[in-house]
Amino acid sequence: MKKKVIFRSGSLRMGGLERVLIEVLQTIDKEKFDIYLVIDDDCGEENIFEKDIPKDIRYFFLKSEELIRETEKYKAKKKNIIYKLIYNLMMEKENRVMYKNMQEILKELGEIDVIVDFDGGASKYIEKLDIKKKIVWIHNSISNLKKKEGKIKRFGKRLEKYDKVVAICDEMKEEIENIYPTLKGKVSRIYNPFNFERIEKLMNDESELTEEQIKMLEEDYCIAISRLDVIQKDYDTLLKSFKILKAKGIEQKLYIIGDGPSKKIIEEWIKEYQLENLVFLLGRMKNPYVWLKNSNFFIHSSKFEGFGLVLVEAGYSGKVVISSRCPVGPRDILKDGECGVLFEVGNEEELADNIEKILKNQELKKEYEKLIKERVKEFDSKNVMKEYEKLIEEI
């Protein structure tokens, strides 16, 4: 008899976690499981991945677009004490609505064998749900919580509510077990799955490019792909490294694909470092893979990461990956520097030196390209989904 499984997550907006969720839903064996999807937020037009949910999966939203919009109205003004109180009341209302709607969904679906809390967002009420087994996925490093003892304790208590905890790389698994020794035996490592067949098709698809973009593809450029958010992504270090290279007479072009709240700050840095003729912000691209395929190499400058999906995608495209040595994620993917180049977070001199080495040493470049292409085979969804399914079957 097939197990009935609910996957739950926060939204269907554009994001790495959401992309992984869709990949899981599209590739999990429906002969083994009856799959249902529960999403917290109905974001209307921002439900980018709603169209990609498999047709044979029923899905539900816990919060309406209207309720979310009403709460957001007060969030923007919560510096004012009155609005802050109203915002807190609205958040309490949202939590009540979510719990009530979840209970109604469970009543409609009948007995559920497993819930997969894909982003940990159900931890406030998970123990109240009449579901046999509960699994939580952890997608981000918890090292940034270490200095906040209260948050560390609260996070540990949340994890204790689940029967299984899944970390997306070995370093993250070790991190969780070291901070929370009582969880040893409950933590598994399962990589994020990648549909390389789909990526291969997109790498060769130039159908939606303009004439100007096709000309840009023919340039000699390296590439960075990430959200324009300087809280997590270390664009200052990245741009400073190109300033150093320019001072040495090395004029390497850099295309940056992505959008986000820090776009203006990054534009100001480009002007300040006089890189207007070398660094180009291309915005969000529906198909970044064709740009990856035609690039010289890939750079990822970040202060911290969860897994770093784009590093695997860059590796599959056969490009050298140069990345920050974040606490988790890139080190695991690049096998601590065996399959790519790592530099210390915030060290623009080291990054500039590494870029120069790759530009000047073609033998080294070819060796890294070969090694990373082989390494990323481990993340193929055909292999990873066997681990997903085994975990759900055996819990």
Task: For the regions a language model picked out, list residue spans one by one.
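A short, active-site helix/loop in glycosyltransferases that binds the activated sugar's phosphate group
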Residues: 124-126, 162-187, 194
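N-terminal strand-loop element at the rim of the active site
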Residues: 7-14, 27, 31-89, 172, ...
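A short, well-ordered alpha-helix in the C-terminal region of glycosyltransferases
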Residues: 350, 357, 364-381, 386-390
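Acidic anion/phosphate-binding donor-loop and adjacent secondary structure
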Residues: 146-148, 174-178, 186, 193-217
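Short hydrophobic beta-strand element within catalytic cores of glycosyltransferases
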Residues: 320-324
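Conserved acidic donor-binding segment of nucleotide-sugar-dependent glycosyltransferases
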Residues: 335-337, 341-348, 357-363
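A conserved mid-protein helix/loop that constitutes part of the nucleotide-sugar donor-binding site
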Residues: 15-23, 220, 224-244, 261-267, ...
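Aromatic "clamp/platform" in nucleotide-sugar-dependent glycosyltransferases that forms part
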Residues: 284, 303
